[in-house]
Amino acid sequence: MENSQLVSITFLAYTIIISIGSINCIDNNNLVTNQSALFVFGDSVFDAGNNNYIDTLSSVRSNYWPYGQTTFKSPTGRVSDGRLIPDFIAEYAWLPLIPPNLQPFNGNSQFAYGVNFASGGAGALVGTFSGLVINLRTQLNNFKKVEEMLRSKLGDAEGKRVISRAVYLFHIGLNDYQYPFTTNSSLFQSISNEKYVDYVVGNMTDVFKEVYNLGGRKFGILNTGPYDCAPASLVIDQTKIRSCFQPVTELINMHNEKLLNGLRRLNHELSGFKYALHDYHTSLSERMNDPSKYGFKEGKKACCGSGPLRGINTCGGRMGLSQSYELCENVTDYLFFDPFHLTEKANRQIAELIWSGPTNITGPYNLKALFELN
């Protein structure tokens, strides 16, 4: 309990300090000019609450208890017990918490520090959970509106400078590979795995290029983690509990290889394009397979859920308010908070690797280096 209170007090103090700094920045154009913003795109790994404000299902929202229990003491829409990776990246960059794009009453000046466009369930393909989420293409369109607003409010030159100095952080693609199997689709009977992955990665690199054409130069990207072996995946086949969901395994591996090659091509083709690619697959696999090395007791069992490994995603009544779920006693023992999403403790560890990890895990730049670039 004392540790939990200390974390909350420390986070509150950080928030107050950053908020005071933000007020100064709003009043002083020079400080705005010299501070790199953070723009976030992606899915539930990064969604800070955008899905709270769209007409969708409870299964792609997390605005209910016990989500948010650790740091915020109430649900925020983040799919974790506390903070997500972008929250920690913002802290390390001395930025305020990056607000969801759809959150009401955001002052325009706050956008100078960045915006979070991510949406739980989103994919790089428009058809992934269509009508229920904000897909990557729509997230890009929302960014374009913010870019226009910044140029209008700050002036064309200053707005362009905010965009060019900003870091653009992405995690997307996993839902594109899971979605066909949640709908019993016959998709892969009519298209090869490789062609499908080409579509996903192609959509991602197209968005990177469009952000580049708008002035963006610094990109942080996570490859796809081993979610074929997450608690939810380990219980899909009830006759083979703890077996990874093999149909997705090949897609994930192919995705990560093609994403790396795509980024290398962009780096060659686009002058000034710089990127930090985090090997999320490796960093998460290491923690799943050897949790005690990283301070966890459970690497493949969720803190919140039901059934074997708490792998059925009923956390907080996600699949219906009448459905029961179990909640662990000590969330810091767990890598996964719910059957698919990490605890705050795990998110912090991953964020640290993205921020200042060595080149074999985040490269050719890390985010700290990107933020320091003029």
Swiss-Prot record:
GO terms for cellular component: extracellular space
Keyword Lipid metabolism assigned: yes
Protein's UniProt keywords contain Transmembrane: no
Glycosylated residues in this chain: 34, 184, 203, 330, 360
UniProt-listed Enzyme Commission number(s): 3.1.1.-
GO molecular function: lipase activity
CDD domains: SGNH_plant_lipase_like (cd01837)
Source domain of life: Eukaryota
Known role: Confers resistance to the necrotrophic fungus Alternaria brassicicola. Possesses lipase and antimicrobial activities that directly disrupt fungal spore integrity. Triggers systemic resistance, mostly by the ethylene-dependent pathway.
Protein name as it appears in the record: GDSL esterase/lipase 1
Naturally occurring in which organism (per UniProt): Arabidopsis thaliana
Gene field: GLIP1
